[in-house]
Amino acid sequence: MLFNLNDEARIIGISGMIGSGKTILAKELARDEEVRGHFANRVLFLTVSQSPNLEELRSLIRDFLTGHEAGFGTALPESVGHTRKLVILDDVRTRESLDQLMFNIPGTTTLVVSQSKLVDPRTTYDVELLNEHDATSLFCLSAFNQKSVPSGFSKSLVKQVVGESKGLPLSLKVLGASLNDRPETYWAIAVERLSRGEPVDETHESKVFAQIEATLENLDPKTKECFLDMGAFPEGKKIPVDVLINMLVKIHDLEDAAAFDVLVDLANRNLLTLVKDPTFVAMGTSYYDIFVTQHDVLRDVALHLTNRGKVSRRDRLLMPKRETMLPSEWERSNDEPYNARVVSIHTGEMTEMDWFDMDFPKAEVLIVNFSSDNYVLPPFIAKMGMLRVFVIINNGTSPAHLHDFPIPTSLTNLRSLWLERVHVPELSSSMIPLKNLHKLYLIICKINNSFDQTAIDIAQIFPKLTDITIDYCDDLAELPSTICGITSLNSISITNCPNIKELPKNISKLQALQLLRLYACPELKSLPVEICELPRLVYVDISHCLSLSSLPEKIGNVRTLEKIDMRECSLSSIPSSAVSLTSLCYVTCYREALWMWKEVEKAVPGLRIEATEKWFNMTWPDE
């Protein structure tokens, strides 16, 4: 049962995104015979809402708990706690409001219904979106006044419409009402409009959006801006938190941790979902293993709010969905510079002739999504002198060849470059140095011999690079030694690269390196002894490196090392020098390897060793 059977005071929560059915669930609980029997019909249901009269609500709760309307000030008689009572507070917006409405009285259970997670997550029920069967029943109730598709009506049309609502009760009810008593021909048109990301009619869209927009008024301005930034990404995709962090940091002047806190706040308000990759269970130091997802309706609201006003004056210039060409309204507005700081493009294959001239003097973030084997980058990049974050993502089935790359001379202010499912362009001595690039991401790319060119001084091209991430690059056989010339590096992450066999022996040149992640590199056989000469190394992840059989004998020299993740390795022992790892505080290994750390555990006070079960399944990322 949801409610406690003892007589202690208790607070529990119901949480979920706007329109998910939280209030309906709470009202059903208030009417439920078993619940009412448990509380002897002593159930109070109050709606708090956005601008509550807290004094009046508090008075109503006090009168309910005392059983009469006599005033007791702030004190309540001892007899109050002798009976069980249920107080349901619906639509609570802030923790401050909740605190003023709470009475810590034995026997009293308070059920808090809120979009945000205001109650301990361990006692909060998260309302899930509806499965197909329940979604269809709810939709049919609204569209046909019955719980099933009427005889003779197209079940295929109903299924398509229900699918577009993605299980959100609010959307299902509004959409059903807009199609009620309409002929099948109208439904067919509605399905076509929905498939294009358009509303069935203005009423359908406005009713859903109005309810969601109202909840955004509680956000502080910066958090609301970050919510609107989510519209820059394609619907239905997992967004790596690293991409979002880089974006928010640059355009909102936030530190990494503060940007992540904003995402957590949005997640707590059910305006997005944070998903942690289950393969990373150790205490890592990167956000790369976390992804963000967002319900399509929430993304549509962000786009709706963003795409108001004159095109050239918008802070964000976003394409809601993939199109063969750029929107015609963009071309009609290109007679003056665009005001956008964030630009997001989503197309198919583009040739040089498909682009038209655009001027983005204020653009700091450019996101290019496409689906093609060949892609010509937009020529107007050459004029984006303020660009800080550049994201290129190919959603096609094979890596694309990029044309008009490397990056033009005007992008020397670039801080972060994300390349996904493309052939990494070959570096050349004529390439203009990216003097301010700090972070480079190569995801599902063909690296070819891009970095392995001794005639090129990579450190000159990337003089300030601090982080390099290489993930799912199956043609990477070894990390080129030239990369070790980038002495500013403090993080190297090589993950899910099935063919890498060794690291360069001159890795000791990376005197600033703090993080070395080598997750799921099954052919990596050893670590170079030079790793023991890294004076600032804090974190090493060698988990799921199935062929790695030993650690360097002098690993104990790395006195700064704090965390090691070595799940699913083939290590048969730990070097005796490991007892000198005086800063080590956290080790993750599989259960059979616990005995290896016994001596180290005795020698290093406070060392925590976490054992996990064996598991490994190297799969390509889902689309």
Curated annotation (Swiss-Prot):
<keyword id="KW-0547">Nucleotide-binding</keyword>
<feature type="repeat" description="LRR 2">
    <location>
        <begin position="512"/>
        <end position="534"/>
    </location>
</feature>
<feature type="binding site">
    <location>
        <begin position="16"/>
        <end position="23"/>
    </location>
    <ligand>
        <name>ATP</name>
    </ligand>
</feature>
<comment type="function">
    <text>Potential disease resistance protein.</text>
</comment>
<dbReference type="InterPro" id="IPR032675">
    <property type="entry name" value="LRR_dom_sf"/>
</dbReference>
<feature type="domain" description="NB-ARC 1">
    <location>
        <begin position="2"/>
        <end position="51"/>
    </location>
</feature>
<feature type="domain" description="NB-ARC 2">
    <location>
        <begin position="119"/>
        <end position="249"/>
    </location>
</feature>
<dbReference type="Pfam" id="PF00931">
    <property type="entry name" value="NB-ARC"/>
</dbReference>
<keyword id="KW-0433">Leucine-rich repeat</keyword>
<keyword id="KW-0677">Repeat</keyword>
<dbReference type="InterPro" id="IPR042197">
    <property type="entry name" value="Apaf_helical"/>
</dbReference>
<dbReference type="GO" id="GO:0006952">
    <property type="term" value="P:defense response"/>
</dbReference>
<keyword id="KW-0067">ATP-binding</keyword>
<keyword id="KW-0611">Plant defense</keyword>
<dbReference type="InterPro" id="IPR002182">
    <property type="entry name" value="NB-ARC"/>
</dbReference>
<dbReference type="InterPro" id="IPR036388">
    <property type="entry name" value="WH-like_DNA-bd_sf"/>
</dbReference>
<comment type="similarity">
    <text>Belongs to the disease resistance NB-LRR family.</text>
</comment>
<feature type="repeat" description="LRR 3">
    <location>
        <begin position="536"/>
        <end position="558"/>
    </location>
</feature>
<protein>
    <recommendedName>
        <fullName>Putative disease resistance protein At5g47280</fullName>
    </recommendedName>
</protein>
<dbReference type="GO" id="GO:0043531">
    <property type="term" value="F:ADP binding"/>
</dbReference>
<dbReference type="GO" id="GO:0005524">
    <property type="term" value="F:ATP binding"/>
</dbReference>
<feature type="repeat" description="LRR 1">
    <location>
        <begin position="488"/>
        <end position="511"/>
    </location>
</feature>
<dbReference type="InterPro" id="IPR027417">
    <property type="entry name" value="P-loop_NTPase"/>
</dbReference>
<feature type="repeat" description="LRR 4">
    <location>
        <begin position="560"/>
        <end position="581"/>
    </location>
</feature>
